[in-house]
Curated annotation (Swiss-Prot):
InterPro entries: bL21-like, bL21-like_sf, Ribosomal_bL21, Ribosomal_bL21_CS
Coiled coil: none
GO cellular component: cytoplasm; ribonucleoprotein complex; ribosome
Pfam family, one: Ribosomal_L21p
Full protein name: Large ribosomal subunit protein bL21
Function as written in the Swiss-Prot or TrEMBL entry: This protein binds to 23S rRNA in the presence of protein L20.
Top-rank taxon, per record: Bacteria
GO biological process: translation
UniProt keywords, alphabetically: Ribonucleoprotein, Ribosomal protein, RNA-binding, rRNA-binding
Annotated organism of origin: Stenotrophomonas maltophilia (strain R551-3)
Length: 105
């Protein structure tokens, strides 16, 4: 069984046992979190699609909090002896999917 969930303004296709990095959530490491905003549920019988399926939920365990690798940004103006360097490290929460509960549309 798999599901498409929405968190942090992004959509993720998940299955039980998967590990993934999502936008940072203010939760403790080791805690259990529940996602209710599920757009799609799929299994061998077919799929259920809807805007926030009622009764559907995905549970996950928080594995770690961290920061991604640095992304380097360089702005350069030719022939003007001008260059601007900047860097960014995005915060993330790493989770493991522990369960997918189905619901009705």
């Amino acid at each position: 069984m798999y599901a498409v969930l929405v968190t942090g303004g992004k959509q993720y296709r998940v299955a039980q046992g998967e590990k993934l990095r999502i936008e940072k959530l203010e939760v403790e490491v080791g805690s259990e979190i529940k996602f209710d905003n599920i757009l799609l549920l799929g299994d061998s019988d077919g799929i259920k699609i809807g805007d926030a399926l009622s009764g559907a939920a995905v549970t996950a365990t928080v594995l770690s909090q961290g920061r991604a690798d640095k992304v380097r940004i360089i702005k350069f103006r030719r022939r003007k002896h001008h260059m601007k360097r900047q860097g960014h490290r995005q915060y993330y929460t790493e989770i493991e999917i522990t369960g997918i509960a189905g619901g009705s549309k």
